[in-house]
Structures are given as structure tokens and as C-alpha cells.
């Protein structure tokens, strides 16, 4: 990541943290105040357009919401909820057993 991208990213995060609208002018003002040398205005306008109308805090909170986040959330759940979260994993294991390739006499080298 280049210095321009980093500076624009950090400036956008600062604006989002303060609850301000992310615009190219505000990004450029923050970057200038930080005395980052020679950032082309294209970077600030790209970041402003990319983040226009989006809640940056919400984006950051949902970064890990892919497939791996559910088990981590299940560990923090209270008593009865933990048992409910573990049930689908057990069903999945049973399905895999049913779909196993038992020797049916159709071997390649029989």
C-alpha cells in the first residue's frame, strides 16, 4: 500500500470516528494538516467516492462476518444458546458420514 493510500485511509477513518461526512476536501485537509508530502488529489476523490453513503464503522464491524465468525460468536453465547449453536455442527458431521464412499465393488483397479 502506498503512502497516498495509507494517508487517505487513515484520514477517512478519522472522519468516520468523528461522525463527519467523508469528502475529498475533508480528506485533503486532514492529509495536509498531517504534513504528508505530495498526495495527489485523485486519491482523496477515489476514497471519498468509494465511501460515499457508507457507514465506515459498520463496514469495520462486519469485516469478519464471513464463515469463520459464527463459531467465535458461539463461544461467547450464554448456556442454552451455546447448545443450540453446537447442534448444526453435529448434524453436519452426521451428513458427512452418510455420504461417505463405502466400498461398493466399483474400484478402478478391481
Swiss-Prot record:
GO terms for cellular component: cytosolic large ribosomal subunit. Coiled coil: none annotated. InterPro entries: P1/P2_N_sf (IPR038716), Ribosomal_P1/P2 (IPR027534). GO terms for molecular function: protein kinase activator activity; ribonucleoprotein complex binding; structural constituent of ribosome. One of its GO terms (biological process) is translational elongation. Residues 85-110 are annotated as: Disordered. Keywords: Allergen, Phosphoprotein, Ribonucleoprotein, Ribosomal protein. The keyword Ribosomal protein applies. Plays an important role in the elongation step of protein synthesis. Belongs to the eukaryotic ribosomal protein P1/P2 family. P1 and P2 exist as dimers at the large ribosomal subunit. This is Large ribosomal subunit protein P1. The gene is CLAH12.
